[in-house]
């Protein structure tokens, strides 16, 4: 029990005994040691989205990590040049070649500011369309999953959308069996508005949220 004191019995040495209370140095404070809470969560990661120049997209699509890192503003790990992400990089490379201005919007690097490491990719599918809609996408390197990076990336994308005056609506398309992504998106007010067929991913459910909702919810949180 915190604050309790442990009192030692007086030594009984022939010819030497302490009557009454023992000397002060014989009383020791007892402090309780609280075990670490296994359920305690680490603080959320702090990330930013780092945009990539067009040639980096092409190098990653070709699986050339060395060439990509020679041009990238941040260091990229091997998974970025893996076959799993090659299709995304190829699509973005072609998109930026046709519309160089889209490079400021499309897929970038999820960069952990504290760890100084690239943990995934995130961005918009392109600039806002005439109605003010942007569609977001994000994916985390398997080595860094289940650490809060998907949430951090989603919040970074929503925060930028809220700041951009031409953006009115944020969209995300999720496969019906991707419950983890649905659960995360639903926490930020995304509501189902339809469905679509993607040639690569198959059936997807379309969810949208007002771009200003995230900024409003942040400003209403207590300090």
Residue ranges and their predicted role:
Residues 2-8:
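Extreme N-terminal basic, low-complexity initiation segments
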Residues 111, 137-146, 174-175:
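A short, internal acetyl-CoA/4′-phosphopantetheine-binding micro-motif in the GNAT/acyltransferase core
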Residues 116, 148, 178:
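Conserved G/P- and acidic residue-centered "switch" motifs that form tight phosphate/ATP-binding loops
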Residues 138-140, 146-160, 183-187:
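Conserved acetyl-CoA-binding loop-helix of GNAT-fold acetyltransferases
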Residues 156, 173-174, 197:
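Proline- and acidic/polar-enriched loop/turn elements at helix boundaries
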Residues 164-173:
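Conserved GNAT acetyl-CoA-binding A-motif
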Residues 172-182:
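Conserved beta-strand-loop-alpha-helix junction that forms the acyl-donor binding cleft
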């Amino acid at each position: 029990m915190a604050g309790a004191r442990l009192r030692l019995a007086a030594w009984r040495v022939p010819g030497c005994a302490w009557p009454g209370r023992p000397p002060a140095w014989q009383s020791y404070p007892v402090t309780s040691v609280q075990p670490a809470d296994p359920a305690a969560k680490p603080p959320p990661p702090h990330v930013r989205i780092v945009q990539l120049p067009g040639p980096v997209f092409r190098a990653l699509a070709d699986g050339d990590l060395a060439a990509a890192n020679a041009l990238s503003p941040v260091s990229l790990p091997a998974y970025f040049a893996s076959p799993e992400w090659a299709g995304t990089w190829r699509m973005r490379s072609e998109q930026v070649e046709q519309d160089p201005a889209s490079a400021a919007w499309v897929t970038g690097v999820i960069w952990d500011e504290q760890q100084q490491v690239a943990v995934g990719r995130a961005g918009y599918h392109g600039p806002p369309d005439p109605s003010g809609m942007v569609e977001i996408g994000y994916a985390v390197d398997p080595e860094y999953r289940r650490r809060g990076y998907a949430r951090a990336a989603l919040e970074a994308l929503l925060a930028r959308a809220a700041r951009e005056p031409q953006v009115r609506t944020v969209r995300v398309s999720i496969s019906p069996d991707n419950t983890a992504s649905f659960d995360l998106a639903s926490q930020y007010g995304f509501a189902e508005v339809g469905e679509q067929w993607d040639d690569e991913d198959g059936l997807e459910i379309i969810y949208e949220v007002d771009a200003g909702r995230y900024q409003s919810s942040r400003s209403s949180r207590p300090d």
